[in-house]
Amino acid sequence: MNEILSKIKSIIIEKLGVDEKKVIPEASFINDLGADSLDSIELIMEFEKEFDIIISDDIAEKLITVDDANQYIKKYLDDKKSF
C-alpha cells in the first residue's frame, strides 16, 4: 500500500470510526462507510490539512470513494512536485 493511501485510510478510520477492513479502494464514503455530508466535509478538511493541499468544492463533490481521494491527492502532489 502506498503512503498516501495509508494516510487516507488512517484519517477515515479515525474520523468515521469504521473497521480497517471496510476501508477498501472502492468503498464509498457515504454508501459503504456511513459518512454523512458533515463527515464528508470533515474528511476533505483533514485531507487538505494532512497533505497540505487545497480541494475545491467542485472536486470535493467528485471524491466519492477512497480510491477517488487517493488518485486525486496523488495527482495533486505529483503536479505540485513538478513546479
Curated annotation (Swiss-Prot):
SUPFAM superfamilies: ACP-like. Keywords: Cytoplasm, Fatty acid biosynthesis, Fatty acid metabolism, Lipid biosynthesis, Lipid metabolism, Phosphopantetheine, Phosphoprotein. The modification O-(pantetheine 4'-phosphoryl)serine is found at residue 37. InterPro entries: ACP, ACP-like_sf, PP-bd_ACP, Ppantetheine_attach_site. PROSITE patterns: CARRIER (PS50075), PHOSPHOPANTETHEINE (PS00012). It is found in: Cytoplasm. It holds the Pfam family PP-binding. GO terms for biological process: lipid A biosynthetic process. It comes from the Bacteria. Residues 2-77 form the Carrier domain. GO terms for cellular component: cytosol; membrane. HAMAP family: Acyl_carrier. Belongs to the acyl carrier protein (ACP) family. This is Acyl carrier protein. It comes from Karelsulcia muelleri (strain GWSS).
